[in-house]
């Protein structure tokens, strides 16, 4: 029986194993550096409170991806706890499981995300509501309007992410809502970032699109938007994203696949234009800031190799056989790391002034983009609104994730957990979101290489891609495996395309690398 060695137990690696088992006779072996399933899409747990590291909506325009999700965890057939408490109506799947009776169920949730700027809330994406103009004030509103009109007439050549945003929103709105947040996220100014990230993350969204959607809603209340960034509902596993990936891992093992933890790929062996093996070193606390190599090594050999490890690490682990130019480009590929603080509080200072009903009338947001320039926090997750089953006590506490973007080794990364938690709390107090005396508990998690970055040597990445594609039995998948800011569904699609190539006996990797770049993956989902 042929074997496939898969580096990484995140969405891409798991999907590769799952598809191989369902559609081929190839035996998959997954080697995972950490002790967790799901990669950055895992669900962390602290004293019964569950954390989604970054916020992961389950929505895809690809029906095969949607079918896999539903196959693993079917849609709810009865109301969730908070919907029952509030009398809210949600679409239900006929014959679907009851989330009050079973855990293996996917909920349908309402997407609410807003921007916190000037100590006020703005819809994200920016909407045409009167509140938007009131909060912006007359002068800012006029500047934004004229700036957008100017951007419609005078188009900039898109050499940077700054150009991309200005062309779609105008300079005043870009300065208000994109410039500072983007610099927080990447650590460099948008003028120094390639426009690719905007094309992949914002895609077809622009102020013109927002206006068009507003007018369609105005004259046709039943109109459904087709822009991914505007989708109003999404699927979400009852206990967070990691629950689904853990279910997939369980199914993989039931079908005969193998998963090994604490295995850090430290050497990729090559021979005659093929990958011939992966040497792993046993680690403790794999993937964390406290990671330690034990020295115990194991070499895994197979017929096919799937890599979801960071491209930089993959190339450097290939040794001196890599061309110098490719080595140098890969070595300097930038990425951003991530810190999240799980914060449990009695209540929030910010009030729910919307018409949306919530438990204890907390703000309805799943996540909030913090645009205030006097703090370093980037995003705030409110896990109660993702799923009422994420907090241990949804009825009387608010469980949040305070998200910071950083670089391994910088001042934030090197802070002790205790100091960082104090710092994060002080920032929420500063911008009037919580009172310090309302804090009940907190935890602190670091995540390495969460965001592949689009500056530095990224401009020459095609040379690295070409080199890696020259190995017929190597398939690079997922966010880190392709150095591309993919969503979960895109990561899954790279795995699906790779398995399709193997089934077809093809060594052409074009379709795999084109996921989330070609128009076919941006097509509107048909009704």
Question: Language model features by range: what are they?
Answer:
Residues 2-30:
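N-terminal Rossmann-like FAD-binding beta1-loop-alpha1 element of flavoenzymes
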Residues 47-152:
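Dinucleotide-binding Rossmann-like beta1-alpha1 core, especially the glycine-rich loop
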